[in-house]
Amino acid sequence: TKGTLDWAYPPFILASTAAALGYEVQIFFTFYGLQLLKKKPNLKVSPLGNPGMPMPMGMDKWFPVLGTAIPGMEAMMTMMMKSKMKAKGIASIEELRSLCLEADVKYIACQMTVDLFDFSPQDLIDGIEFGGAAMFLAFAGDSDICLYV
């Protein structure tokens, strides 16, 4: 994930679904993905450089790509996305994250990245483990399914 709202959903959707189907699930969070483990994530939609993002009101047809770089566009797009998700009954990232933990999905925060970005364990939610890529790969190497999102 890129640590943005729109990129935060796939790992949690896949993990919660896999756990519900009885799979043992682990998610390794590194670099900007660590944003998803913050107690108070401030995730935003990033319309710039996201060509697959459907734009509201047909904006993709009449609003140039550079227009998404206008100050305030990211905040506006984030507000619109959150509003639409709420109207459609889609769980928030915080809700999905909690559901995964309740379903025994194991979260591993990359210790190297935690150190690199000067995160404190107090910045992150409870119930996570800290480890390196080798810790995750020991699990992934024996898995029938391993996805990189």
Model-derived regions: residue spans:
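Short, glycine-rich nucleotide/cofactor-binding loops
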Residues: 1-8, 37-40, 84-88
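Histidine-anchored nucleotide/phosphate-binding helix
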Residues: 8-22, 27
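Anion (oxyanion) recognition and catalysis
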Residues: 19-20, 101, 140-141
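N-terminal beta-loop-helix "entrance" segment that forms/cooperates
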Residues: 34-47
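A glycine-rich helix N-cap at a beta->alpha junction
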Residues: 45-85, 89
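A charged, amphipathic interaction segment
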Residues: 74-135
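Gly/Ser-rich helix-loop-strand patches that form or flank binding pockets
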Residues: 138-148
